[in-house]
Amino acid sequence: VKDKKIVCNDFHLKDPERIIVVTGPNQGGKTTFARMFGQLHYLASLGLEVPGTKAQLKIPDRIFTHFEREENVETLYGKLQSDLLRMKEILDNATKDSIVIINEFLSSTSLRDAILIGKQILEILTKLDCFGVWVTFIDEFSSYSEKTVSMVSTVDPADPVKRTFKIVRKPSDGLAYAIHIAEKYGLTYETLKERIKS
């Protein structure tokens, strides 16, 4: 695409770090980062070159992914139950040599339940000692233990509506920047109130 710059992202894990927890604003490149992590490990496991200036990657026995799926009306399971069953299958089969990639898991339940369930899953993953990425809106996961690392999707400091698509290693800041998106589309409380009046 003309005039579009490729955004390069780096990551590293140092012992005992195992799980990269990616937080930050919507549409900031978090899911693309998770896919990139999986693709790098997949290409390396095939013995192929990987995109990047330098890479030292673990060759996994398996790569497990948990990305959002549409609800299957034939199973009669709700979204949360379906997600939990898929996660159980991953946890039952993953080993210390596996890669686990989780994207926006637990978005279909309350924040309190999501934190509770998520911490139990992090407990299992860190005990397994496998490597992985977890993209989430739950900042608490990024500081769960010495085995978790926080990376954050960044925005342009001059204009928080603009995403940089740069994912950097830093503590989660708890900012979703949703109000800026609402302002961009004229969906603030004030503008909606004015529309209702007129």
List each language-model region with its residue ranges.
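ATPase nucleotide-binding head domains, primarily ABC-like/P-loop NTPase cores
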Residues: V1-S198
